[in-house]
C-alpha cells in the first residue's frame, strides 16, 4: 500500500512536470520518450500507432462541435477517454487499461442503434449531413489506426481487448453516421454503380 502511494505521488510529480513543460529539445535528434521512460524512433511502429490514435481522437473532438444528441455526445466523449487510455497502453508496453466491458459496451451500442435503422440494400457513400460526414471521416481514420495497432501487435503483443475495441469502434462509427443522418432527417448517400 505504501509503495503504491509513493508510486502515485511520483507519477503525479512526473506527469505534472511533463504536462507543464511544452518543449524539452530531447526529440530534436529523431527519438521520443515513451510512458515507461524508454526511447524510440519517431517513425517507429509504436509512434505511428500513437499518432493515428491521436488523429482519430482529434476527429471525434471535431465531431463533438456539431449539433448532436446528448446521448451521442456522451458516447463520443467516453470513446475519447478510451482512446486516450489506448494511447497510454501503446506508450507503455505491457500496460493494460482497455477491458472486456469496454468492448461489450460498444457492441451493445451498435446493436441498440442498428436495430432501429432500415436494412441496407446498397453500399453507402460518406456524406449526407456534415456531422455524418465527419463521422465517416472518423471511421476511415479509425480503420487506419486499427491497421497501425495490428501492425504493432505483429511485433509486440498488444492487449487483446484493445485490438477488439479499435475494430468494433469503426463499426460503431459507421452505424452512428447513419443514426446522425436519421436524426437530422437527411438521407444516406447510396452508391450507384452506373451513375452518369
What kind of feature is each model-predicted range?
Residues 7-196:
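Phosphate/pyrophosphate-binding loop motifs in nucleotide- or prenyl diphosphate-using proteins
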